[in-house]
Amino acid sequence: MRTVLDAEAVQALLAHSHRAHREVRARLEIGRRLGASAVVPTVALAELYRGRDRSGALDALLARERRALVLRDTDRALARLVGGVLQAAGAGSEDLVDAHAIAVAAEDDRAVVLTGDPGDLERLAAPYPGVTVVALS
């Protein structure tokens, strides 16, 4: 099983004061114990790279968590799957980053997507029964 983090879930890891920081940490630890990978679509990082301080903090987090977090670049196969996610949901390019999270999840038989935006992701995930969207509290 795979756990996919969207930008909000990565932001929760980044900021100790974030309301979902402990929740994301706990879910990653449970996943690690079960042998599940934690994956971040690299396109989601574009939503987080903002200014030198914040970008530096994000790079430090990714370096510190390099064994826990797998970055998934968009290759041609993933791009094709993302297009399929958008098409199946009747969505446009405004949902491109969210569609990447669902597509990365759909690459595995069973996956969980951690998100602060469950509405859009649930709509995109509807055609994929093995993908479960979990809202951060």
Protein language model regions, located:
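Phosphate- and divalent-cation-binding pockets in alpha/beta enzyme and binding domains
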Residues: 47, 57, 81, 123-124
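Conserved beta-strand termini and adjacent loop/short-helix elements that scaffold enzyme active sites
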Residues: 41-43, 72-74, 116, 134-137
